[in-house]
Amino acid sequence: MKQLAIIIFLITSLYSHEANCLNMFAMIFDKNTTDENAAKCIEYYIDELGCDVNIVPSFANDGSNLLDAAYENNKTKTFDLLLNKDITPGKWLTAIIATEFLVFFRENSDGIKDKKASPELLEFIKTHKYKEFKEEKFKLIKKLLDHGQNPYHYGYLRVILKIVGDEKDLDRLLEQYKKDNK
């Protein structure tokens, strides 16, 4: 009977620990929690409670993680903290970045229709506004690659950029990464 009680205690302790660790997602998604406070709390959960920075909740069928949540909620300090805690950037984040390009194109031109760039979009990609946006996103991509993201996952973004005839910079960035990490 004593052994059964110990086993039950251990199982409930493990479940309780994982449930506590999932609170890190709540801190990121909570609009009332500042980025600074979210970063401090998450650091506590990782360093003091031993939570796994690469935790993926069972309800996240797509495999999204804390890094994806921090990025989508514009919590930059939390995002940087997670990278410094050796989180593994996943493929979901590359899809988010690729989608941001599509949304940006749509907000500033007619966008892409039927796998073709509109004439307005082809003119837009020559503007300073687009070049600034692309530079910001490419800095992020480089940062993610430097933290272990698989360059293969940028295939979707490459397809989007190829449609507008602007895939060469991404190709160079990915090739340079592959060369530097052989």
What are these regions (language model features)?
Residues 1-18:
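Classical Sec-dependent N-terminal signal peptides that target proteins to the secretory pathway
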Residues 35-47, 74-84, 104-111, 133-145, ...:
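Ankyrin repeat structural motif
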